[in-house]
């Protein structure tokens, strides 16, 4: 595409103007954007450093876990790797500032002055050449007018030829000047774009090297990192062995473990040195399913009829409420014994196990050590201090061992063994047994109560002890003493259920009491 000198001249001037009015201002804007880019990258590096410091802290937490130790080490390694990559990125952006931002700032200020001067010089030289050409053309016109109308035509003809050559020469010069000026302007523009591209290529080379290093580093570590987290349900073999040991312990608690007394928590706060169930559970048989035998002297002050009524009411209350009888009995036991730091008991009646291997045999006055502090349906589990035999025995056949009787300092026992009132009755050597006439009176009263519709007194087999106590009369203890749970065991008045019957004295001088 051919262009005239004027069009090429306009192209040259426009090229210079584009560099001054668009390229250089664009460089200034690029410098500002580059500085913002630097700030953003530096902020990103600082934020990344803080972030991966947090990752490392979480990794340290994971190293303390028995199943996540390896994952914790991986998190720490990921943190250190990314911080190293961020440090390398920071070094590359220092080169970005040095090679691009700094150079552009320096070149832009100088180039504005240079391009302005170059354009002015080109325009001035171009104007001078045009002026010379125009003068030569004007002289040529004058010569031609003179040669056409003058007498010395040959003389003017020779001068005309000289001016034509001068105009032609000056036209060639100005065309050459315009062409060279256009070429120079375009090259100046290209040099500036080349400079910008070259600087960014240099920075891109640094970034490429950074990414190559990062890729090589990550490719060497990433598969191992992924392997540690591929299965979240995998548990180390050591931990699995520990879990299996927990699932299948050496011993399991006995299914017939007595229910704890409501006072057990209070007792635990007072004494912590009694034996626990788990210590003896492997050798402990289940508690007997039948209710424990009742002490022969437990109901000696109760009227049989009223005792039967009281027993029936108690049983009905237990059935209605649906509570555990052992829990009710534990509540009814005197609280003073719960608070005593005892673990040994003394037998007040003999007991024979017979063919039942789960029961414990002992004689009167033997010392037993409680292995289970709680009571189950009137049964306690303990060890004979002399024979070292273990088994279940009725709690009513024992009493707490007094401090002056113990050989060593007793340990706390939260078990409600028996009411103090019962222990006092059985501990005294001189127990007053009602005379036969009193028994007959009781029998008559019981017979009259039966006729009146009173509840039937439990049979002797229900409350008879396995072994008859010494010095016992022919009358059955259970027939004389009534039910197994007298009211005075719950802390009430022991004579609250005793009724005064009409009595006639043999002394005629005494008044008749009705």
From Swiss-Prot:
Its main location: cytoplasm. The modification Phosphoserine is found at residues 261, 281, 332, 413, 419, 421. The IMD domain is predicted to have a helical structure. It may induce actin bundling and filopodia formation. The modification Phosphothreonine is found at residues 248, 257, 411. Phosphorylated on tyrosine in response to insulin. Disulfide bonds: none annotated. It comes from Mus musculus (Mouse). GO terms for biological process: plasma membrane organization; positive regulation of actin filament polymerization; regulation of actin cytoskeleton organization. The keyword Cytoplasm applies. InterPro entries: AH/BAR_dom_sf, Baiap2l1_I-BAR_dom, I-BAR_dom, IRSp53/IRTKS/Pinkbar, IRTKS_SH3, SH3-like_dom_sf, SH3_domain. It comes from the Eukaryota. Residues 340-403 form the SH3 domain. Residues 471-481 have a biased composition (Polar residues). Residues 486-514 are annotated as: Binds F-actin. One of its GO terms (molecular function) is actin binding. May function as adapter protein. Involved in the formation of clusters of actin bundles. Plays a role in the reorganization of the actin cytoskeleton in response to bacterial infection. Detected in bladder, liver, testis, heart, lung, spleen, brain and skeletal muscle (at protein level). This is BAR/IMD domain-containing adapter protein 2-like 1. Interacts with RAC1. Binds to F-actin. Interacts with FASLG. Residues 1-249 form the IMD domain. GO terms for cellular component: actin cytoskeleton; cytosol; nucleoplasm; plasma membrane.
């Amino acid at each position: 595409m051919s262009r005239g000198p004027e069009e090429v001249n306009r192209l040259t001037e426009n090229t210079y103007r584009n560099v001054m009015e668009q390229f250089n201002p664009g460089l200034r804007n690029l410098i500002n954007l580059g500085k913002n880019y630097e700030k953003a990258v530096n902020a990103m590096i600082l934020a990344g450093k803080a972030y991966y410091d947090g990752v490392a802290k979480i990794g340290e937490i994971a190293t303390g876990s028995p199943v996540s130790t390896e994952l914790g080490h991986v998190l720490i390694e990921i943190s250190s790797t990314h911080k190293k990559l961020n440090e390398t990125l920071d070094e590359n952006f220092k080169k970005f500032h040095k090679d691009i931002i700094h150079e552009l700032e320096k070149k832009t200020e100088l180039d504005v002055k240079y391009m302005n001067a170059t354009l002015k010089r080109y325009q001035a030289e171009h104007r001078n050449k045009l002026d010379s050409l125009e003068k030569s053309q004007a002289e040529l016109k004058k010569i031609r007018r003179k040669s056409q109308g003058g007498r010395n035509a040959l003389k003017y003809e020779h001068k005309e030829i000289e001016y034509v050559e001068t105009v032609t020469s000056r036209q060639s010069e100005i065309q050459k000047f315009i062409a060279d000026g256009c070429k120079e302007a375009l090259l100046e523009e290209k040099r500036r774009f080349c400079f910008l591209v070259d600087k960014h290529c240099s920075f891109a080379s640094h970034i490429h090297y950074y990414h190559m290093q990062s890729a090589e580093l990550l490719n060497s570590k990433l598969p191992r990192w992924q392997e540690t987290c591929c299965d979240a349900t995998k548990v180390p073999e050591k931990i699995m062995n520990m879990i299996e040991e927990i699932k299948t312990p050496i011993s399991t608690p006995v299914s017939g473990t007595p229910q704890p007394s409501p006072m057990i928590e209070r007792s635990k706060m007072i004494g912590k040195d009694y034996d626990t169930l788990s210590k003896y559970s492997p050798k402990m048989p289940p508690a007997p399913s039948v209710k424990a035998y009742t002490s022969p002297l437990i109901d000696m002050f109760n009227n049989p009829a009223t005792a039967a009524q009281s027993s029936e009411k108690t049983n009905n209350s237990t059935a209605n409420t649906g509570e555990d009888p052992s829990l009710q009995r534990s509540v009814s036991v005197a609280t003073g014994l719960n608070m005593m730091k005892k673990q040994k008991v003394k037998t007040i009646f003999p007991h024979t196990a017979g063919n039942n291997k789960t029961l414990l045999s002992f004689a009167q006055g033997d010392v037993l050590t409680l292995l289970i502090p709680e009571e189950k349906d009137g049964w306690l589990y303990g060890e004979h201090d002399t024979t070292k035999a273990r088994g279940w025995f009725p709690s009513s056949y024992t009493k707490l061992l007094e401090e002056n009787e113990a050989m060593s300092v007793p340990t706390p026992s939260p078990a409600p063994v028996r009411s103090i009132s019962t222990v006092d009755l059985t501990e005294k050597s001189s127990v007053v047994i009602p005379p036969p006439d009193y028994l007959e009176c009781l029998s008559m009263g019981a017979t009259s109560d039966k006729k009146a519709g009173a509840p039937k007194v439990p049979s002797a087999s229900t409350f008879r002890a396995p072994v008859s106590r010494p010095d016992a009369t022919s009358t059955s203890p259970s027939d004389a003493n009534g039910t197994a749970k007298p009211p005075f065991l719950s802390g009430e008045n022991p004579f609250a259920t005793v009724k005064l019957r009409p009595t006639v004295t043999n002394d005629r001088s005494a008044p008749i009491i009705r």
